[in-house]
């Protein structure tokens, strides 16, 4: 990929001038002046209807953003991304989570070897294992079928699987799936306290099988299991997803119960691999395959569609417009589905760990904003929590509204109430409420002029708050796969434009190193070589 500082491009300089021209324009006027605005800024693709017309953009804005993508050689970068080039240059690795959902006849090479046949082998193993656990063919050490699955992992080995299993809960089978991630012992013991060791299967997910949190939790769970079963039965109840075969075998896991990972798949993009075994067990392999199919369809859309009609490209460029020109620092993601409760927190890792970088691909400090802060909660809960700040606060917060035309239980009364709020919020954020409208409303309620003058300023909404409306036919495994992949590719586009490496995460290393040092000090009762604040805190903790 070419390393281009975006601020040096012609398009960037023109966008700076363009921003000065339109920064004070109100979107209401944009709509009033163009009756076809919604048509011009809507993309309908398969079961996705994405309206991005409620943004502070014009056709000129879009043209300049597309010019920026061209000047940053986005098309070449996409080819490098899907072609298996080592675009994660700080670790000298390709970034090929897309290969995990590629067609079985695809040819995707890493070090001159097609990786797709190996991916297909692992998928077949996931399928067979899932089917055997779900139908009771594979049993626990006392001959009972499994009833509970516990996934032990952290970061990408947890956030993706837990998000998808909760999002697709409607499609779950009889197995109960639990997740242990935090090294907090209370979290571990609370999860396992009511489980039956005879009918519980544990999945330990760690690429290196050395991650402190995961290994500590796995060891605690094994000790709990061994209070009821002999050591030799560990192999029937513990499965590993890892590359470290020796460490896994030393733990007591049978080699046939080891599922491989690859270093060309980053943790936060790994749910499509055997890391997603818990997903396959929860919803069945056919639904897991549908999830992958949906992601592959979004991959194809991203690769093959012109940038003008390309969902990930358009959403990424609009995000850059706000981040770098309006200086917006955060984006909210609001799914109008309680099933997607964990989706914003999943995106927090995917986006913030990927693009939270301050050094560009040339090794130079950037002099422009990069990664956005991501946050959100499902609607309508979020309306009663933090929408006040979005509507009347001092910060510009672009917001994605994700909704579904059809509910899963087909309760039209509830669905209509939910979606009425979904549409109303984007309209309210667009239009706001003027002082004149407030006065008229209060007069209609028989308020005196004195009362109106006292409170009217507090009831004015400026509006002009940008939103994207992502409306999907129905929440299915396939549509969920498309949605996740949409944001994955948005991350990639932003990283290309910002000239940063999106697929490493060196920022998490220092804290780990210091934690290991402090852990040793708890045993030795020493607090040397710390700042005065940390030293005092450690002494208080150890007292």
Swiss-Prot record:
Broadest EC class assigned to this enzyme: isomerase
UniProt subcellular location: Cytoplasm
PROSITE patterns xref list: P_GLUCOSE_ISOMERASE_1, P_GLUCOSE_ISOMERASE_2, P_GLUCOSE_ISOMERASE_3
GO CC annotations, alphabetized: cytosol
Main location class: cytoplasm
GO biological process: gluconeogenesis; glucose 6-phosphate metabolic process; glycolytic process
GO molecular function, one term: carbohydrate derivative binding
Active site (UniProt): 353, 384, 512
Gene3D superfamilies: 1.10.1390.10, Glucose-6-phosphate isomerase like protein, domain 1
Transmembrane residue ranges: none
Catalytic activity, EC: 5.3.1.9
UniProt pathway: Carbohydrate biosynthesis; gluconeogenesis; Carbohydrate degradation; glycolysis; D-glyceraldehyde 3-phosphate and glycerone phosphate from D-glucose: step 2/4
Keywords (A to Z) from UniProt: Cytoplasm, Gluconeogenesis, Glycolysis, Isomerase
Alphabetized InterPro entries for the sequence: G6P_Isomerase, G6P_Isomerase_C, Phosphoglucose_isomerase_CS, SIS_dom_sf, SIS_PGI_1, SIS_PGI_2
Record field: catalytic activity: alpha-D-glucose 6-phosphate = beta-D-fructose 6-phosphate
Superkingdom of origin organism: Bacteria
SUPFAM superfamilies, A to Z: SIS domain
PANTHER family: GLUCOSE-6-PHOSPHATE ISOMERASE (PTHR11469:SF1)
Entry's family note: Belongs to the GPI family.
Function: Catalyzes the reversible isomerization of glucose-6-phosphate to fructose-6-phosphate.
Protein name per the record: Glucose-6-phosphate isomerase
UniProt source species: Christiangramia forsetii (strain DSM 17595 / CGMCC 1.15422 / KT0803)
Top-level taxonomy: Bacteria, Pseudomonadati, Bacteroidota, Flavobacteriia, Flavobacteriales
Designated gene of the protein: pgi
